[in-house]
Amino acid sequence: MEEKAKMRRLSTWKLKLRMFLATVLLFGLIYAILMVVGSILGLGGPLFYALLGFGVIFLQYLISPKIVELTMNVHYVSEAEAPRLHAMVDELARRAGIPKPMVGIAEIALPNAFAFGRTKADGRVCVTRGILNLLDEEELRAVLGHEISHIKHSDMIVMTLVSAVPLICYYIFWSTVFSRDDEANLVGIAALIAYFIGQLIVLFISRTREYYADQGSVEIGGQPHKLASALYKLVLRLSPVQQGRPETGRGCQGLLPE
């Protein structure tokens, strides 16, 4: 059991590292190319970096589904391959009043489900092999309702747009780092402050959208206890005790009866 826990932790670590490195490499390369182009054209002021931020966000919007598919090892399944999964997604999408999303499975042990895509018409719902093995059918339906609610509320677009603000502020700050102009330095400091404030706002909005998705799952699925049960199983599976580290999972031991 301890060996399986170690393998699960290693798989999770590799997955996160792969996602991080792919994102950093891609957008780092894009940013470097645009920096060189801007330098050749004699561009380098705050306006250029603001436009650069918009460009990066737009590019992210266009290619982010492909990044998710590659990093999460997603493959889409037909109704013949996964009839029950398709039936649940179809029913929940009809109740939510949106087109049926594409249905995918990620062949990883980490229990997870996620929605992605550019628009409601381009929505995709994916579950991992780990969550399929962990939850019963009604719990999985509740989790799928949560993800479909993200598509219904256009959360992918909303988060892309709100994330643009701190990113643009960061680019503006970077454009003033090596400037000797006092006014430019003041602009840079203001942009840096705005960046940190913007990040906090983005985190708040993200958490709020998660609450809305929970509510949406109940509205279209009607089983809040199943969503709670699914979340409990997910937390328990990812807890230190389940991962073979009981010594780090004793923080709530005093709440348990002797």
Curated annotation (Swiss-Prot):
CDD domains attached to this UniProt entry: M48B_HtpX_like
Where this protein primarily resides, as one coarse class? Answer: membrane
Q: Name one GO biological process term.
A: proteolysis
Its required cofactor(s), as named, are: Zn(2+)
The record places the active site at 147
Residues annotated for Zn(2+) binding in this entry? 146, 150, 210
Question: Per the UniProt record, which EC number(s) apply here?
Answer: 3.4.24.-
The record's keywords, sorted A to Z, are: Cell membrane, Hydrolase, Membrane, Metal-binding, Metalloprotease, Protease, Transmembrane, Transmembrane helix, Zinc
Q: Where in the cell is it found?
A: Cell membrane
- Which intervals of the chain form a coiled coil? none
Keyword check for Transmembrane helix, yes or no.
yes
Q: Which domain of life is it from?
A: Archaea
Task: Tell me one Pfam family matched here.
Answer: Peptidase_M48
UniProt enzyme class: hydrolase
Gene Ontology, cellular component aspect? plasma membrane
> What does the cofactor section's free text say about binding?
Binds 1 zinc ion per subunit.
Any stretches that span the bilayer, and where are they?
24-44, 45-65, 157-177, 186-206
Q: Which GO terms describe its molecular function?
A: metalloendopeptidase activity; zinc ion binding
Question: Topology relative to the membrane, per the entry?
Answer: Multi-pass membrane protein
* Family matches, as InterPro entries: HtpX_protease (IPR050083), Pept_M48_protease_HtpX (IPR022919), Peptidase_M48 (IPR001915)
Query: Which HAMAP family does UniProt cross-reference here?
Result: Pept_M48_protease_HtpX
Q: Which family does it belong to?
A: Belongs to the peptidase M48B family.
Protein's UniProt name: Protease HtpX homolog
